[in-house]
Design a protein with these regions (language model features):
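Catalytic cores of nucleotide-sugar-dependent glycosyltransferases that transfer UDP/GDP/TDP-activated
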Residues: 1-319
């Protein structure tokens, strides 16, 4: 049986700010449990709803050298929807009313998280064949695996996959600050490794040292090899083109089933879609103060208002 660990800064239903949480919450439960043991590890934020905290059970704790101090690392565990979830607990780093805060503080706390994930694994009775890292917040996991965790039988042979959900956000900080907190040596701060300009770059570290790289579509995989879309990392993307794959995010057919979805006005299915779905169109027209017209073309987009999401293309087509 193959063992896979998803490492992420967010995951539904526990904590969500964007689409990353949907992917990390939905994909693990889609693996065939006869062949794959897929688990997820993420921070235990104080801003998580109490109902999720109440499900967590103490697993273990230890102290870890980090940024010149001995830091507490607690590990909690729960099983939800057939998937085992681990939560890294540290009130110093994960207390607050939202998961992401001030930029420099986020850099430090996710460096802590990445090191804590690897430090905790030998105590969890779970040795993954693959660690699947998501976005810049987990970018140092592949780096640490090649550095301070490279020795010993436990970590030998563990592979990493780095998935880019949004290349724009990379986890940059000044090189000296980056070195001091991460504990990484000067060796890693060259332009072919973690350095970009005057900064250390967490995402770049993951992209350099991961065994494979994925992103959210074949089109995006090609786009990020270009200077226009590459966010300063297009050269690295071209260099790693043989290891880069685009995989389109799927749909959760349980949560987004219109026949059972309690969040729509009228539920429908394959047999009655033409009769029933129109009621939802009328409802949103009424809610938005629009003319209720069954023949009026409507486009609905669940998205952030950013140029990355293609709103310029919609405006162009409308014109």
């Amino acid at each position: 049986m193959k063992k896979v660990l998803f490492a992420s800064s967010e995951c539904v239903p526990f904590i969500k700010t964007g689409g990353l949480a949907d992917v990390v919450g939905s994909l693990p439960k889609c693996f065939d449990k006869r062949y794959y043991d897929v688990r997820v590890i993420l921070p235990k934020y104080s801003c998580m709803k109490q109902q999720w905290k109440d499900m967590m059970q103490y697993k273990t704790h230890f102290y870890m050298d980090f940024a010149g101090q001995s830091q507490y690392v607690g590990v909690l565990e729960c099983v939800y929807d057939g998937v085992t979830f681990y939560f890294i607990d540290n009130e110093h780093y994960f207390t607050g009313d939202k998961p992401y805060t001030e930029h420099h503080w986020d850099i430090e706390k996710f460096m802590y998280f990445d090191r804590a994930v690897l430090s905790a694994l030998p105590l969890l009775d779970f040795r993954p064949d693959v660690i699947h890292c998501h976005d810049w917040q987990t970018g140092l996991i592949p780096v640490y695996l090649h550095d301070s965790f490279a020795g010993g039988d436990f970590f030998r042979g563990i592979k990493t996959v780095m998935t880019i959900h949004n290349l724009k956000f990379q986890g940059n900080d000044g090189v000296e600050q980056f070195k001091r907190i991460s504990g990484l040596s000067d060796y890693y701060f060259t332009i072919d490794k973690l350095r970009t300009g005057v900064d250390g770059n967490m995402l770049k570290g993951g992209l350099v040292y991961a065994d494979a790289i994925t992103t959210v579509s074949n089109t995006y995989a090609e786009e990020i090899k270009t200077q226009f879309y590459g966010e300063g990392l297009d050269g690295l993307m071209r260099a790693r083109a043989n290891d880069l794959r685009g995989i389109v995010n799927g749909i959760d057919y349980v949560d987004y089933n219109p026949d059972t979805d309690k969040n729509i006005v009228v539920r429908y299915n394959y047999d009655n879609v033409l009769e029933k779905k129109i009621h939802n169109k009328r409802a949103i027209q009424a809610e938005l103060g629009l003319a209720q017209d069954d023949n009026r073309f409507m486009i609905g987009i669940v998205s952030r208002l950013t140029d990355q999401k293609g709103f310029d293309l919609i405006a162009y087509m409308m014109e």
